[in-house]
Amino acid sequence: MKSITIKGSERESVGKVATKALRNAGAVPCVLYGGDQPVHFSADERAFKSLVYTPNAHTVVIEVEGGKSYNAVMQDIQVHPVTDKILHLDFYQLFEDKEVTMEVPVRIIGTSPGVLLGGVLRLNSRKLKVKALPANLPDFLDADISPLEMGNKIYVTALANEKYKILHPENTVVCQVRISRAAMKAAQEAAKAAKAPAGKKKK
């Protein structure tokens, strides 16, 4: 999985006054969990844009003053309900030998015969939770729709891989090709025409 580097500074004070001052200065207060002790730090709000405002998933390298560096994933985010300004971020530290749970985006590949015939592709699950060692975290979960005919579905079992575990029930639908209204109407009209009685023969 691709990684983003965040450069920050350790926080000496974590009180409300200090937190407000950080935000007024354009910084975001953060906490890194998962190690022996939580690490409180802050970074410029602009540093998080490529991490937060994207559909892609990334791991993070947190570099703080003093030469300290931590591998992590974003665990939680708080944003202002009106301005969408980032208020706080929680991270979870990664270790090479310890599995981590993370949401990974689904990527559609291939061309569906059902779509070519007028069906509508519906993506039911844009992201799926997976559990894996950090080195095995995928950037995407590829869903190949090449075999999908009209009315067919792809379940999470089709995306299984020995390097990671998908944390969803086996009957979870990832995507499906639904019959469009136009195609359904055409099929109904064709069926009616086939059942209609033949016209009377002239004498």
UniProtKB/Swiss-Prot annotation:
<dbReference type="GO" id="GO:0008097">
    <property type="term" value="F:5S rRNA binding"/>
</dbReference>
<dbReference type="InterPro" id="IPR020057">
    <property type="entry name" value="Ribosomal_bL25_b-dom"/>
</dbReference>
<dbReference type="InterPro" id="IPR011035">
    <property type="entry name" value="Ribosomal_bL25/Gln-tRNA_synth"/>
</dbReference>
<dbReference type="InterPro" id="IPR037121">
    <property type="entry name" value="Ribosomal_bL25_C"/>
</dbReference>
<dbReference type="InterPro" id="IPR020056">
    <property type="entry name" value="Rbsml_bL25/Gln-tRNA_synth_N"/>
</dbReference>
<keyword id="KW-0694">RNA-binding</keyword>
<comment type="subunit">
    <text>Part of the 50S ribosomal subunit; part of the 5S rRNA/L5/L18/L25 subcomplex. Contacts the 5S rRNA. Binds to the 5S rRNA independently of L5 and L18.</text>
</comment>
<comment type="function">
    <text>This is one of the proteins that binds to the 5S RNA in the ribosome where it forms part of the central protuberance.</text>
</comment>
<dbReference type="GO" id="GO:0006412">
    <property type="term" value="P:translation"/>
</dbReference>
<keyword id="KW-0699">rRNA-binding</keyword>
<dbReference type="GO" id="GO:0022625">
    <property type="term" value="C:cytosolic large ribosomal subunit"/>
</dbReference>
<dbReference type="InterPro" id="IPR020930">
    <property type="entry name" value="Ribosomal_uL5_bac-type"/>
</dbReference>
<dbReference type="GO" id="GO:0003735">
    <property type="term" value="F:structural constituent of ribosome"/>
</dbReference>
<dbReference type="Pfam" id="PF14693">
    <property type="entry name" value="Ribosomal_TL5_C"/>
</dbReference>
<keyword id="KW-0687">Ribonucleoprotein</keyword>
<dbReference type="InterPro" id="IPR001021">
    <property type="entry name" value="Ribosomal_bL25_long"/>
</dbReference>
<keyword id="KW-0689">Ribosomal protein</keyword>
<comment type="similarity">
    <text>Belongs to the bacterial ribosomal protein bL25 family. CTC subfamily.</text>
</comment>
<protein>
    <recommendedName>
        <fullName>Large ribosomal subunit protein bL25</fullName>
    </recommendedName>
</protein>
<dbReference type="InterPro" id="IPR029751">
    <property type="entry name" value="Ribosomal_L25_dom"/>
</dbReference>
<dbReference type="Pfam" id="PF01386">
    <property type="entry name" value="Ribosomal_L25p"/>
</dbReference>
